[in-house]
Curated annotation (Swiss-Prot):
Catalyzes the first step in hexosamine metabolism, converting fructose-6P into glucosamine-6P using glutamine as a nitrogen source. Homodimer. Residues 285-425, 458-599 form the SIS domain. It comes from the Bacteria. InterPro entries: GATase_2_dom, GFAT, GFAT_N, GlmS/AgaS_SIS, GlmS/FrlB_SIS, Ntn_hydrolases_N, SIS_dom, SIS_dom_sf. GO terms for cellular component: cytosol. It is found in: Cytoplasm. Residues 2-217 form the Glutamine amidotransferase type-2 domain. GO terms for molecular function: carbohydrate derivative binding; glutamine-fructose-6-phosphate transaminase (isomerizing) activity. It is an enzyme of class 2 (transferase). Keywords: Aminotransferase, Cytoplasm, Glutamine amidotransferase, Repeat, Transferase. This is Glutamine--fructose-6-phosphate aminotransferase [isomerizing]. PANTHER family: GLUCOSAMINE--FRUCTOSE-6-PHOSPHATE AMINOTRANSFERASE, ISOMERIZING (PTHR10937), GLUTAMINE--FRUCTOSE-6-PHOSPHATE TRANSAMINASE (ISOMERIZING) (PTHR10937:SF0).
Length: 609
């Protein structure tokens, strides 16, 4: 992995490829490259480091062509070297690849026996040689690709050019996202619409097992059986403006500040309906949701913490049992399946491989009803789900998720309301009260954003630290986990989170004067318990940084620093308390001088295991 772009046009496509790769930088990468068909010759430029360095090299070599492919690589097989960077070439065939080929060693040995030699450590070079091998018998590039993919085990998105066929290039998809952009006399392929939005907003999403041929004047798509197939054309709502920084220093900062609008857009349908109709989740949602007897949530990373928060809501308000599992664990265990339990998958991109595979596994076990919560329309997970609700967060570029998380919480709260209503657990008066809380949520988030100057001062104290501890209880324990994740992701400070009640069962051994302890302390029924836990920290010399509600009775004292969030927002308080931990992570990373939007070793869309 991590990003693919390709183009065929009546103009020089090198600027399109370079711009596309720059727009894919947010996904995370460590090297990049392009290959173009210049006359009857494949010319290639690859570099480790930033796309800008590769672009300078391409300019120096005066690369120009009407057909080409490009790639940003995040190392999986083989280290970060120019030899391992894509595109890979076998004779006159050049290829870029996202994904992991699980049987690459067996294929490598077979190819060596046929006389092929390898210049890299990657699984991708195996595919290039296989395509070249099949060209001899297949006679054309598309057929060679179709023969090749049938020999591959694993996940892939591929784009391939051949010097023998200058009028077209081909692509394939299995387990990794890939789309086609349709233009006027030009066509494109990309792993993400942001890579081609400067050229076209008309896109076709390839399905699992699809292969395709792209020419200047048209596109042909074939299914997994190599039969011609039509796929629908969509108009993407991603705009160039959403991919620009504007007045902000980083995309993460921009996206933190976009949360009031993102939340308002996400809850708009419920506000307009003056309630929580099941139709928020699909035309047949009422019939599906009325009969379920429990909920099982599958997700990874930040989305998993959103699911953890929802478990408190679903069990307390809707009165249904709810379990939350890390998708990569669930898919490999002998799980118990209750067909009456709703499977909910959460993924910002809608393409997270572990979550997609967990969904497939749940279906194979006999789960009848599935619902996905995603931010990207027409992505793989929604297409594989019975019901779907899209967060309306807009494009999220920063690797560390912010507005996707809070809008996921907003959707999960609405799901709780729908389930509670259908289960007869919520009265009309209670529904009206919850709706009012939801209505005020964007404004409360804006008030929390106004705490930024105070949090910046805290960040200066955090920046020299090497470790941090986050504590929360009940609904706010998942927010403590999210705060710790954000801090470690972008500042590289080792941070852990625990339920505050677990302090005495181990984590208290870590507390000393050098350990900052962040406490989420809303004015709820567990506040006095949290205060007792805070005393345990102070007694060991730990320094406390407390996020408390306006109506919580806290004050600064020696070793205790307090920032007051807006007045307690009831069951939606976790959304409010997310904002300050995001800001703390952002400004601490800023103070430490890290690359906020592209943290080391991380990718935005995790489309491999």
């Amino acid at each position: 992995m991590c990003g693919i772009v390709g183009a065929i046009a009546g103009r020089d496509v090198v600027p399109v490829l370079i711009e596309g790769l720059k727009r894919l930088e947010y996904r995370g990468y460590d090297s990049s490259g392009i290959a173009v068909l210049d006359g009857a010759q494949v010319r290639r430029v690859r570099r480790t480091g930033r796309v800008a360095e590769m672009a300078q090299a391409a300019q120096a070599e005066q690369l120009g062509a009407t057909l080409g492919i490009g790639h940003t690589r995040w190392a999986t097989h083989g280290g970060v070297t120019e030899a391992n960077a894509h595109p890979h070439i076998s004779a006159g065939v050049a290829l870029v690849h996202n994904g992991i080929i699980e049987n690459h060693e067996a294929q490598r040995e077979k190819l060596r026996a046929l006389g092929y030699t390898f210049e890299s450590q990657t699984d991708t070079e195996v595919i290039a040689h296989l395509i070249h091998h099949h060209l001899g018998s297949a006679g054309d590039l598309l057929t060679a690709l179709q023969h090749t993919v049938k020999e591959l085990t694993g996940a892939y998105a591929l784009a391939v050019v051949s010097q023998a066929e200058p009028e077209r290039f081909v692509c394939a998809r299995m387990g990794c996202p890939l789309l086609i952009g349709v233009g006027e006399g030009e066509n494109f392929v990309a792993s993400d619409v942001s890579a081609i939005v400067q050229a076209t907003r008309q896109v076709i999403f390839l399905e699992e097992g699809d292969t395709a041929e792209l020419r200047r004047d048209g596109v042909r798509i074939f299914d997994g059986n190599d039969a011609p197939v039509e796929r629908p054309l969509h108009l993407s709502d991603v705009s160039l403006a959403s991919l620009e920084l504007g007045p902000f220093r980083h995309f993460m900062q921009k996206e933190i500040h976009e949360q009031p609008r993102a939340l308002a857009d996400t809850i708009e349908a419920a506000i307009d309906a003056k309630g929580f109709p099941a139709s928020l989740f699909g035309a047949n949602a009422e019939a599906v949701l009325r009969d379920i007897e429990g909920v099982q949530i599958l997700a990874c990373g930040t989305s998993y913490y959103a699911g953890m928060t929802a478990r408190y809501w679903i069990e307390a308000i809707a009165g249904l049992p709810c379990s939350v599992e890390i998708a990569s664990e669930y898919r490999y265990r002998a799980a118990y399946a209750n067909p009456k339990h709703l499977i909910v998958t959460i993924s910002q991109s809608g393409e997270t491989l572990d979550t997609m595979e967990a969904l497939k596994y749940a279906k194979s076990l006999g789960h009848l009803h599935t619902l996905s919560i995603c931010n990207v329309p027409e992505s793989a997970i929604p297409r594989a789900s019975e019901l779907v609700c899209y967060t309306r967060a807009g494009a999220e570029i920063g690797v560390a998720s912010t507005k996707a998380f809070t809008t996921q919480l907003a959707v999960l709260f609405q799901l709780t309301m729908v389930l509670g209503t259908l289960q007869g657990r919520i009265s009309d008066a209670e529904e009206a009260e919850y709706l009012e809380q939801l209505r005020f949520l964007p404004g409360s988030v804006q008030h929390a954003l106004n705490l930024e100057p105070q949090i910046m001062a805290w960040a200066e104290r955090f920046s020299p630290k090497e470790n941090a501890l986050f504590l929360g209880r009940g609904l706010h324990y998942p927010i403590a986990l999210e705060g710790a994740l954000k801090l470690k992701e972008i500042s590289y400070i080792h941070a852990e989170a625990y339920p505050a009640g677990e302090l005495k069962h181990g984590p208290l051994a870590l507390v000393d004067a050098a350990m900052p302890v962040v406490v989420i302390a809303p004015n709820d029924r567990l506040l006095e318990k949290v205060k007792s836990n805070m005393q345990e920290v102070r007694a060991r010399g730990g320094e406390l940084f407390v996020f408390a509600d306006q109506d919580s009775h806290f004050s600064d004292s020696e070793g205790v620093h307090v920032i007051r969030t807006p007045r307690h927002a009831g069951v939606l308080s976790p959304v409010i308390h997310t904002i300050p931990v995001q800001l703390l992570a952002y400004h601490t990373a800023l103070a430490r001088g890290t690359d906020v939007d592209k943290p080391r070793n991380l990718a935005k869309s995790v489309t491999v295991e």
